[in-house]
Amino acid sequence: MSGLRKATGGYDEVPSDWMSATGTRALVLQDPCLLWLEHHGHKFGFKEDPEEYSFLSFIGAAGQKFEEHWLKNFAPNAVYGLEKDWDVRKVEGLQRTVALMQAGHPVISKAALWWAPEKIYGTADLICKQSWLAETFPGSCPQPDGRDGYVVVDAKFTRNLASSKAADLRMYSHQLRLYSYMLGNIQGQMPESAYLVTRDRIADPIRVGVEMELGQPLDPELARLRDLHLHIKLHGADYRPWQDEIVAPGLGNKKDEPWHLAKKKIVKALRGTPLEMLPHIGAVQKKGLQAFGFEHLEDLLCPEAAEFPFHALAGIGEQTERRIQAVLAANRTGEVIGAEDAILPPRCDVELFVDFEFFSDINVDFENDWPKLNGCPIIFMIGAGWLEKGTWKFRQFVAAEEYPDAERKMFENFLSFLHKMGIFDNARSAALYHWSPAEKWQADAAESRHGLKRLSDLPWVDLRKVFADTPIGIRGAWGYGLKEIVMAVGEYAPQFHSPWPEDLSSGLSAMVMGWEAYKQPRPLDSPEMSTLSKYLEADVKGLMTVLRWLQDQCPGPYHNQQASGRGGWYAMARAG
């Protein structure tokens, strides 16, 4: 293939001023701080997150298994361009890949690709003959029109890319287009398409248009991202994420492992509080505010900004504007905003505070669950707290195993406990307080799995909805996360202080910790379960503290759904 010499540029190893095809990730996620941390963080004392309970490591291992099983089922005779991904930096990996292409192998896994003129390189999961793809997936991939060249196929252990994960799809599409550009120039034929295999599109790959021509420069958007990446990589030591916008942390991006903790430190060191700390303010709304001269939250705290029309920003409606204004007013004046307007049940005869720990469906048994890959989405831990004669009580319920039958047994025990506590006694008023809709829809899902009808008849009250819909603002809280509300309440009224553990960096780490617990001979006695229990109790005790503070602020009467007209979030609490 004539493109090999041009692809290498005469180098034996990838030079330091090239970009990997995965290098656009942080920029697409609008979080250039991650790129700065990767290349310069250690010089400034920043360290990666601990490996233990890393969700990134977990999902990376799952992705590798997904690719292996896809090959086993669809292309068992695939050959490998590289033994290890990192060998892509050596010219021998590229030479082997090109030799396999010249031999006409229909499927090549771990294909090394370089293109020196554009300073890019990378390892494609697969490159496949277009005819092989068309024969294997006749409904998704067309037969070649002329020469039978190679096209890029990447395997991603994710789902719903085409419907609800626009940023992820854009990120993966950039990778595939970069791979395709290199492949096209090496083989002398630019592919029209590349393909994404995902867990819900195993035999129906997602098509990605390449939209570049042979011998032409890289697409302008990809070139822009490449140039920015290389500038940060090569010259980023001159920048500081806490003061330079070009490498600033993106608060809207939660996929920040392995730099989650380092990024938190940087956010605390920022010269001004980021605008994205406000509810529903993302990158688009931030640009809109900056156009009006607001660079930081402090700019919005001046009295002159009190009447700013947030509804003029893209995606901000009337209710969202009211939330933002309540948060700003509280932090501007130091006063609690809106609490006197909150609609709550009166103190009930039975009040319980509940939180669930949940497993998503990504812990998959690839051997036994192929191709459905449904995993085991269950609630594995329930925390319930209450006050008994003024003394805090806490009880937890844990599934003995990571199986649906164990979840059912746990819920049967939980429902028996609720019965003893009087939750189902129609002669008594009762409420189960929680934070966010998760507990309600997870309980409904468990009811569907197990036929436990009582789960659909629980008197839930979503305290987060009380705060967000009233809306309530309190100094120190810029949003409506449980932890920040609990912390703000404790600062405002120290008698309502509730401590918070710092063992877990995120809910995703909690899931990985739970999965690790179930690998142990006695999972319920494992250190992981002990840590999760402490975290769970902090959640439910925080709920109790917030409710008591709110009742102290607003001892108003119970209103039913019809009387209030606010959608009925409180109507599930049962009046005696």
Region locations from a protein language model:
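A non-catalytic, helix-rich entry segment at domain boundaries
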Residues: 41-97, 302-342, 346, 523, ...
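Acidic, Mg2+-coordinating catalytic module of metal-dependent nucleases/exonucleases
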Residues: 194-198, 207-277, 283-286, 490-567
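Helix-hairpin-helix
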Residues: 271-325
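Flexible loop/turn segments at secondary-structure boundaries
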Residues: 15, 44, 160-162, 203-204, ...
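RNase H-like, metal-dependent nuclease domains and their acidic two-metal-ion catalytic environment used
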Residues: 344, 353-389, 530-576
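Metal-dependent nuclease catalytic cores that hydrolyze phosphodiester bonds in DNA/RNA
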Residues: 1-143
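Conserved RNase H-like, two-metal-ion catalytic cores of nucleic-acid enzymes
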Residues: 102, 115, 139-143, 338-424, ...
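Conserved DEDDh/DEDDy metal-dependent 3′-5′ exonuclease domain
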Residues: 106-109, 117, 121-132, 146-147, ...
